[in-house]
Each structure stands twice: as structure tokens, then as C-alpha cells.
Curated annotation (Swiss-Prot):
UniProt name for this protein: Phosphoinositide-3-kinase-interacting protein 1
Bilayer topology term: Single-pass type I membrane protein
All residue ranges annotated as the Kringle domain in the record: 24-101
Location(s) in or outside the cell: Cell membrane
Species classification: Eukaryota, Metazoa, Chordata, Craniata, Vertebrata
GO-annotated molecular function: endopeptidase activity; phosphatidylinositol 3-kinase inhibitor activity; signaling receptor binding
SUPFAM superfamilies per record: Kringle-like (SSF57440)
Species whose genome carries this gene: Rattus norvegicus
Cited function: Negative regulator of hepatic phosphatidylinositol 3-kinase (PI3K) activity.
Keyword Transmembrane helix: yes
Secretion signal, residue range per the UniProt entry: 1-21
Length: 267
């Protein structure tokens, strides 16, 4: 269990060192210095920053913290320094010696900004003293070509406003022509609607007359049996006439009655 805690502690220290990226060093004026050196030179000892800044002379300078390591709070070009006790007992500023850290590519900071006008000229290609350029005064108005190049971007709303202002008045003749064209277009539309309505009504009327004519032709060409109802047939009645006068019958031979030949019995 103790071994696990030791591994965790060492790993956390390594992660913190990598996070700071200095490995116990700090950057100052483009150089890497050790941050835990309490001596500016052999045989000397740095005073605590808070204790050394107790005097009125050093209160105006920022305090690096509650320690006695070499720092550079006032950005001294000579590098980090610290306060030491002088012969009179007054804190004295003393630059630190042999404070450099071994610089590596991984610890190298971004390139510092150029500190002189010469470096700026070399970087951005600005001509030096050999080539002198004459600039117009600040209050001078630009030329037409320059003004056209420096014009701001015009938005949609500004374009709409400009176009509305640039409209020209067509005059009375323009208004008359506009009204005339409007009336002509309306008349053409009304004529198209009326013509379509008349044509449609005429077609419907012709279709109706054609249907009536077809029905009449069908009625004429039908047979007679189509007009009779077989359930209501009329039967012809025959009249029989009976007369009371009988015509005498011709007596033929052999057709007389037996009574005539034999006579009455007992006669």
C-alpha cells in the first residue's frame, strides 16, 4: 500500500513538472534560469523578498513571493537578482551569477518580439534610411482611385435606399401610358373569359340538341312491336247470328223415315 502511494506521489510530481514545462526553471528576457537558487554568488545569501521589501525604497517594486530565490520582478536586462545584506545592514540589490538552465528545444519559448526598429524593418520588409518615402499629411484628402479602393462595404439596406432615391419621374405621359397598358391588359383578360364562357355554353347547347335528335331517330326506327304491350292484347270477338226460319231439306230416296214406309202400327 505504501509503495502504491509513493508511485502516485512521484507520478504527480512528474506530471506537474511537465505541465509547467520548465523543469525547475523559469523564463526571463528570452533565457532560462533556475528558479531555486538562493545565492547570487558564492559566499552570499539572498534575503527574503517580503523581509527585504519592508523598507520604503523597495515598496514600489512588485514582490515575487515569500521566498529568497533569484527573480527579476522589475525586468532588469541583466537578468534575475535578489537582495543581500550590505555592510550597513541595508538590503542591497545584487545580480545572480551562474543561474542559467540548460535550454532544450522542447523548453524553448516562442520567439520574442523584435526590440528594435531594424529587426522590424528586416521582418516586414520596410525600407530603411537608404530609401526615403514621402507620405502625405494625415488631413489630406485621398485621390479618386484611392477613395474608390477605401470605400466601405455597402449593405443590402443601403443599396435599396440608394436605388429608391435614384428613381426618375416619368411624367404625365408615362403615367398615361401605364394606365393605358393596364386597361388593355384587363380588357384582354375579360375578353378571354367571356369568349371561353360563350364557347362553353354553345358547346353544351349543341350537345343537348344532338342528344334530343338521337332520341327522336331511335323512336322512329323502332318496330311496331315496341309500342304494343303483350299483356294488354285485344282479342277480336266473333258474332254468331241464329235465324228462326229453316230451309226445307231435300228428300232423297232411301232417306225417308221408317214410319212412312210401314205406316202407323194398327192401321
Amino acid at each position: 500500500m505504501l509503495l502504491a502511494w509513493v508511485h502516485t506521489f512521484l507520478l504527480s510530481n512528474m506530471l506537474l513538472a511537465e505541465a509547467y514545462g520548465s523543469g525547475g526553471c523559469f523564463w526571463d528576457n528570452g533565457h532560462l534560469y533556475r528558479e531555486d537558487q538562493p545565492s547570487p554568488a558564492p559566499g552570499l545569501r539572498c534575503l527574503n523578498w517580503l523581509a527585504a521589501q519592508g523598507s520604503g525604497e523597495s515598496l514600489a517594486q512588485p514582490s515575487p513571493g515569500n521566498h529568497n530565490y533569484c527573480r527579476n520582478p522589475d525586468q532588469d536586462p541583466r537578468g534575475p537578482w535578489c537582495y543581500i545584506s550590505s555592510e550597513t545592514g541595508v538590503p542591497e540589490k545584487r545580480p545572480c551569477e551562474d543561474l542559467r538552465c540548460p535550454e532544450t528545444t522542447s523548453q524553448a519559448p516562442p520567439p520574442p518580439p523584435p526590440s528594435s526598429t531594424t529587426e522590424l524593418e528586416e521582418k516586414f520588409g520596410v525600407p530603411g534610411d537608404k530609401e526615403t518615402q514621402v507620405f502625405p499629411p494625415a488631413n489630406a484628402l485621398p485621390a479618386r482611385s484611392e477613395a474608390a479602393e477605401v470605400q466601405p462595404v455597402i449593405g443590402i439596406s443601403q443599396r435599396v435606399r440608394m436605388n429608391s432615391k435614384e428613381k426618375k419621374d416619368l411624367g404625365t405621359l408615362g403615367y398615361v401610358l401605364g394606365v393605358t397598358m393596364t386597361v388593355i391588359i384587363i380588357a384582354i383578360g375579360v375578353g378571354i373569359v367571356l369568349g371561353y364562357t360563350y364557347k362553353r355554353g354553345k358547346d353544351l347547347k349543341e350537345q343537348h340538341e344532338q342528344k334530343v335528335c338521337e332520341r327522336e331517330m331511335q323512336r322512329i326506327t323502332l318496330p311496331l312491336s315496341a309500342f304494343t304491350n303483350p299483356t294488354c292484347e285485344i282479342m277480336d270477338e266473333k258474332t254468331i247470328i241464329v235465324h228462326s226460319n229453316q230451309t226445307p231439306a231435300d228428300v232423297q230416296e232411301g232417306s225417308t223415315l221408317l214410319t212412312d214406309q210401314a205406316g202407323t202400327p194398327g192401321a
